[in-house]
Amino acid sequence: MSKEDVKDKFSLEKVGILEGHGGAVTSLVCGEGENGAPLLISGSRDKSIIKWKLTLYNPKEEIIKLDEEDIEEGQPTEIKKVLVGQPLKSLHGHNHFVSSLALNSDSTKLVSASWDKTIRLWDIPSSKSEKLFKGHTKDVLSIAFSHDERLIFSGGMDNSLKYWNTKGETKYENNQFRGWVSCILNITKGKNNYIAVGSWDGSVKILGSDFNVQREIPGGEYAVTSLSADDAGDYLFIAYKNGTVKVMNIEDKDSEKESDVKQVIETGIDINAILFESKFFQIYALGTSKGLQIRKIKGKKPEFEDNENGACLALTYDKSKEYLFAGFADGTIKVYKTVNEGES
């Protein structure tokens, strides 16, 4: 079966929800917990971080009776809520919105960025904050580990990209941005490692393993809100606030080459998050101002939409790519099972 055949078989099934945050869910990361079970961690505008105990294979159903005043004629009088996990531990320390999270490869260390201008390094097994990083002069928006996890990258509203060691010491600062540093993505292509950095000035800078800027994708009129890449490190997916998605060659040096831009997609809706997964070939997920969308790269309309919970701000897959997690502005996290019927 060809890739073209497989990609048309992808779909999502709603599994259930996670409830525990008192504010919008802004960031999601998923690693591997005990016995190989997915370890989901979320950050929120309620200033907290939650480690979740997932019960994906043993959901709990609740029947919620609706207030008679809220029921329109002919509508159901009750709804079924399916819970697929519960908060295992809440991590507190930030005194403003938690804006971004990054988890290391063995799921033992977490870094969090906050609008309180700080970064925290957490030990996941003990759920304790190990280090407080201070240095940004304004809200911190984005965070990422370097490929070897010896350094931490952070970007903020002070238009700076900072490099830290795990002791909380600033090793280098890049002030070449003309707008907020909104998103950071670690990319590996063969033996080469890159850091892609998006800004509200509309530009994306590609940094090499020496952390010097190797290439800049020029800025446009609209802010870059999210970045994603394929597993092989060939293509970079850039989401802009106005709803444009660009698919670019990561290693092309000449940003003006026509061949550099593989695809430009106009979705017509504000984008908060983008997530591409190579397993599903031409399929990518979008968190938008209205909800969740699943799209094909060459498709003009969404293949799947969920607009029940308002804006979708965060997206992640579990390690097996069996589940998609989406964080919403109403504080809920929805869980979807990926169905790839073309797989044998």
What name fits each language-model region?
Residues 15-18, 88-90, 128-133, 169-174, ...:
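A short beta-strand motif characteristic of beta-propeller blades
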Residues 18-25, 84, 91-98, 134-140, ...:
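WD40/WD-repeat beta-propeller blade N-cap
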Residues 32-36, 105-106, 147-148, 188-191, ...:
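Residue-level detector of Asp-centered blade-edge/turn motifs that repeat once per structural unit
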Residues 43-46, 113-116, 154-158, 198-201, ...:
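Conserved strand-to-loop turn within each blade of WD40 beta-propeller repeats
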Residues 49-53, 119-122, 161-165, 204-208, ...:
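WD40-repeat beta-propellers
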Residues 313-344:
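Blade-level signature of beta-propeller repeat domains, shared across WD40, Kelch, NHL, RCC1
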